[in-house]
Amino acid sequence: MPIDCRGRILSDDYYDAITDFPVELLEDYTDEQCYADVDGLYNVIYFGREELRNPQAYFISYRSVPKLYGLMQEGGGTGGFDPNSLIASGITQVQREPLALTGRGVIICIVDTGIDYTDPVFRNEDGTSRILAIWDQTVQTGTPPAGFQYGTEFTREDINRALQSEDPYSVVPSRDEIGHGSALASVAAGSRLNGGYTFQGAAPGADIVVVKLKECKPYLRSFYLVPQGVPAYQENDIMLGVQYADGFAEPFRRPVVICLGMGTNYGDHTGNSPLGRYLSAVAVKRSRAVVVAGGNEGNAAHHFQGQLNNQGGTGANSRAVEVRVEQGVEGFVMELWGSLPDIFTIAVRTPGGETIPPVRLGIRGQITYSFIYEKSRVTVTGNLVEPVSGEELVVMRVQDPTPGIWTFQIEAVGEIHNGEFNMWLPVSQFLSAPVYFLESSPYITLTEPSMASSVIGVSTYDAANNSFYINSGRGFSRCGAIRPDFAAPGVDVPTVNGKGSDSSLAAAITAGAVAQFMQWAVVEQNNSVVESREIKNYFIRGASRSFDVTYPNREWGYGRLNMVGTFDALIGV
């Protein structure tokens, strides 16, 4: 019996692919088609493994294989509510008269792990829900949203019926088992409880829409060597979640702020991934804004920046890159991006002294190496011209790595014109034990897609003492674009689950601030056609800056989020 489209989307027997070409061209690759359109920009294709005529071509096609994104969290905390982060951002001040900006009339959408819809922090004073809808991609017992083929959509009416029931989850069986999505939603839009003394979010008057993402398919977890039990989400599911959020408000002509607290180290670190490009396309729409966390990779030693030249000595036409692999690492995927117009080769030396000669795969190719005395396997995939960036990309997939120092010898072919190359290891949570560069760079460590051109990408600081958060990602982008845009509080931030410290909370605070601005601009018709790029630049003009720091810089971007400063800048103060 043929499996339906929903079955293909959910089954590990079917591969997912992200394409930007007409679906008719897929006849060259597979006989049957099941696909989802992403706003006319991309198609997500689902096809059986046995239907694929050339399986290796699928995995070599870098952009077609969905990347995996992890939660930008670093563990929960304890402690009650305090408004320090909101005050430092000027958010509490503009909640008060005369501006009275609470996000009223604005929709904040959290694309994440779901939400605890029963918590009072997501209810109105009369006990009804402030959540307009939940698209739970993991629940298949109900009806999907219009235009989508999997999951179940729960409306505000459904949620209110559940809240009146003795067993709410028998009516709306959507839970946030991890708590990350609930934390973000509470920081961005949590209700004012007990007059704001017990809890309040940045935009307590905003409505909420939630997308609960399904976890990645096992074949992708295996391909990227992500440990079992670690939350990991597919790029295409996130894209469809963003599309749902964008489209939900269209019938109501409501402004929307989309908050993404996830990230990855896969990609060219210029915002050119399919997700990054799609987020930028949404962000330039009127009455839309997209806020993305900058990640927690700044202190992880997961980035190496190298420079080759023709002069000999340090930085000559060859460079040894050493990677320390601790005991217990199941595997890792590492990427090298080589700058135009140079061509690079890679040789490998294991901790046991076995070697792989310099690898050069031509236009596109893949080769796997095994060793005599070590059980490790190394698969090298090369793209001489990565289609969007135009630069050389080499992906190294290392399975069962021997603990110790791995040496990757990077060499340029022929005369060197630029000589720069960058390498990234996976985000920390995608490693079963530490793996890191012995000579790392803390810069260009913002996670994708925070470097997408039109989104608001933020780094993280501690509002208690105005210090930069040591784990926060740092800019700029690989091509030198100014990222982050600014920093927002993300240390000891009160959430519905206790205090937390990570970049996703900085993004949530910023999303709430954006909702405040959209209330003033769109709902109150002071600038009804504003979009993400304009809001970003208003916020940049109002950001707090220290007199002894040069801006923009790699840590702070243009300064610290300051809503009072933003409105002062509007009136010329």
Predicted regions and their residues:
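Catalytic cores of secreted or luminal carbohydrate-active enzymes
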Residues: 257-258, 275-312, 559, 563-568
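Subtilisin-like serine protease catalytic core
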Residues: 95-234, 329-330, 341-342, 451-454, ...
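Noncatalytic modules at the cell exterior or secretory-pathway interfaces
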Residues: 329-332, 397-415
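Autoinhibitory propeptides
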Residues: 1-107, 113-130, 404, 444-448
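Extracellular S/T/G-rich loop segment that most often corresponds to the catalytic His/Ser-adjacent loop
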Residues: 135-137, 148-158, 300-392, 410-411, ...
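Edge beta-strands of jelly-roll/beta-sandwich modules across compartments, strongly enriched
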Residues: 415-428
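Hydrolase catalytic cores
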Residues: 185-188, 196, 209-217, 246-256, ...
